[in-house]
Amino acid sequence: MDHDVRHPVHPPRSANTLRTLLAVALAGSVAACTTTPTAPPAVELPAATIDHLDLDHWWTEFDEPALTALVDEALANNLDLQAAMARIESARAQVELAQADLYPLVTIGADASRSRSTQVGTNPLPPGFAATGNDYRLGLNASYEVDLWGKYRTSTRAAQNDLLASEFGRETVRTSVAAEVARAYFGLIAADAQLRLLQDTLALREQTVALQTDRAQAGVIGQYDLAQAKAERDSVAGDIATAQRAANELESALAVLTGRSPRDVFTPHVGREPSLAKLLAVPSVPSGLPSNLLERRPDVRQLEKQIVAASLRIDRAHLDFLPSLTLTGTLGTESGTLRRLFSGPAFIWSAAAGLVEPLLIVKSLEANVDIAVAQREQIAVGYRQTVQAAFKDVHDALAANDTTRAALAAQTSRTANLQQAYDLSDVRYKAGYSPYLEVLDAQRQLLQAQTQQILAARDVRLALVDLAKALGGGWDYQNAVGTTADAK
């Protein structure tokens, strides 16, 4: 009796292998289809005190045409800015390189070969066929990896955000250059004012020495008073040399900042408006904590774009776990003789498609993900540090703006009082009521007060420069590239 015994049908081993590969691919797809947040880390911010600031060209608020001309010259020729522009061009080329992966790779090739085959080997030539022959080939070769999962689109977006970051980096350099030019300019104006004060004082001391010499020769005063007068004259002459050195250094610094030639740096001549009255005048610049400080600061915006780019690179590293589909094709001619290379029967073509899933390189792919995550974390930490520094800069600059103005007011009052004291001591000395040492002491204190007044006026302007820079002034942040066209 026959029994109909049904045995289980086992799928072939190749089918099991295919299922395993598909399962791995599916698992990789699930793991890779995550999206990394591109927003910068959250930070606690202080309350804003003002809503609007117009500081795009803050240096014009000082009403110093010479300063405006120097800043314009620096923004056109400064070497740090030129280096920043070169970095932008490099980032732009990286975008083009990333975009190239989105298109097929097409090459043209020509080959010529000569070979000999055996008639007695494993695959012998049939009788009558030549053992030696030529082969000529000419054709187009194309390959294209289909961007199924958006790998190359993600790489392109990352490169675009790098480009935006480099553009904000240029604006960071721009704001720094403008501030450094202004600081050097006001330092130079103060040095000029000190020089004029010292030169005027030296002229008075020379007159005093001449007068005291005559009085000593007449026996009215002794050699002690004459020696004191000469010592005071020499002290002022030494101060003039020191002030001149400071002015020379500031002139050469401005020559470097404005991108002038080494010859001009060695023999600089910087146009300026040396006016003590203008230096002592306190300009009015709006101050406070703007509500859009983080938008105004190009260094913060630069790191925001770097965070976006780093997040996209994490996504790109995850997408490498997914299978890739590559299409290849060839179109051309092939013949054993050159004269028949372009005839009808010589035409050849081929087309192929391949699906590849990474298996044995998973460890390296995981390492790439870890590297990308660590790089994003580094940038995120840098972002938090930069935000901290931004608010510290504003806090310190606002405080300096108040304290330097108070110091200038005090020094101005002190100078006026010491001027009165000097005038009285001079009258008393000439009337014979006080020794010459009292006059010298009054002169010395007055000169010191006048010098401190000049430095206090300089510090007021330097504080305003620092405040404008801290508030993100010096660039057109509202119309900056990347503000409305983010590549996220």
Predicted regions and their residues:
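Sec/SRP-type N-terminal targeting helices
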Residues: 82-83, 99, 146-174, 224, ...
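Acidic, low-complexity, intrinsically disordered peripheral segments
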Residues: 262, 281-282, 431, 452-488
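C-terminal motif of bacterial Sec signal peptides marking the signal peptidase cleavage site
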Residues: 29-32
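Bacterial N-terminal signal peptides that target proteins for export
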Residues: 4-21
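Bacterial Sec-pathway N-terminal export signals of envelope proteins
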Residues: 34-96, 278-308, 358-359, 384-387, ...
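Small/polar, glycine/serine/threonine/aspartate-rich low-complexity segments that form flexible
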Residues: 53-62, 111-141, 264-286, 315, ...
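Periplasmic alpha-helical coiled-coil/stalk elements that build and connect Gram-negative outer-membrane
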Residues: 168-289, 400, 404, 424, ...
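Amphipathic alpha-helical coiled-coil scaffold segments and their short linker/junction regions
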Residues: 52, 60, 69, 75, ...
